[in-house]
């Protein structure tokens, strides 16, 4: 879930159908954006293999202190390394092989001068010690950082949420999406009065003599930096087991102590969700680390194996249905959407923020698939189609590369409708399911590019989808099917499309008669069997606009048919 889509997710963008929003001014990027978003030379030569993170959280003064011991593999010789840690946090020292290293700071990036030779293929270790007051999240999870909250009994409730802001907002690391450690330890020390829950499995709990407790969690799989999370509060715990495609998956639930009975009822949706998503996407990606659902004071976040939940135990999105169909009120949005990210976002991860659609389009599409699993195929389609009213077509879905810049919030609903449209083109649900499961298998625990995902879907479908991806991901256009129906003669063409766009589309010429037409940018004419002109429709499962050119001018507005 991303900060840029706050209004869209709430469904507060009224009356937007096919109209395009006013063009936004082009973004202006800085050196800081490049240092954050690109694989700089000081990053490119080393591969993070293990993070050993130890952090003490001090709620009395909202400070943290600790260190991250970074194990990395050398891929080329270098003398300088980039480590990211955001202001106002302070690096105390950086140590390798017992020697303190000199650094220079450039905003949120530290450039470490190395003393020891960096031999290609060797594994090395470096420890970064730091402290300070981390950025406080203004509007978590969208504008992220540390959250110093209290529960309804005014007890401390401390969590992190930092996908867009970056993990370096509270701990030092190589803060780029394309490099994940193979595993990670997360050891968090907090006052004894609270319980702390992080990613992976709990390995030890140490009660210290100074009134604090250290919780040591361990993740045995690759993990995104931004997925690493602190959750400290007055939690209670209960567990269950899901019999899944890879055997027994442990389910651990961490609601606040006074919400446990409510949680047991609401969290019963987890097993049907897992069953649905395993059937469509393949096995849950983290059997070794388990599945956790943790109550948080913010709305929610896809923290790997530790999904943050703050939907107030309501169905829908804070009790509302984003699709406007009613179907979304029959399940909990946060459980479904954020858990879908375990497949698309956590197991399959973008290399660059510009390709965020890989996370959000698929997770939003998963909402429709869950609706299909529980309410039927028609309801699933209606849910996805209902989300079109939230599409703005303001800027392209794909952002700018190398500067930590995601594109339009349309990556959610427009991206989901693009995938729903492609499903129609595949026109074979078994094959479509195979494509989705194949994505999960082929790119299991990998970072990827848009081109890889586009290429895989095109290859496995046997269709050249390049122009379709270009249209929906790289422009703000919606394909418009212009047509003229004169008796049994249908003339048609595509407009408002990228050059070479020739997507087939399904039409109905009677309530029971479906057929395909193959428009291009040039006019085509076909004879159709039509009993009544009003029986002609373009299948609404296609996200396109439709324009009848023979209607009177006053009625000739663009009408959303797909």
Question: What name fits each language-model region?
Answer:
Residues 22, 81, 86-149, 524-531:
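A surface-exposed beta-strand-loop module
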Residues 67-88, 171-191, 451, 490-508:
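Surface-exposed beta-strand/loop patches in extracellular or lumenal glycoproteins
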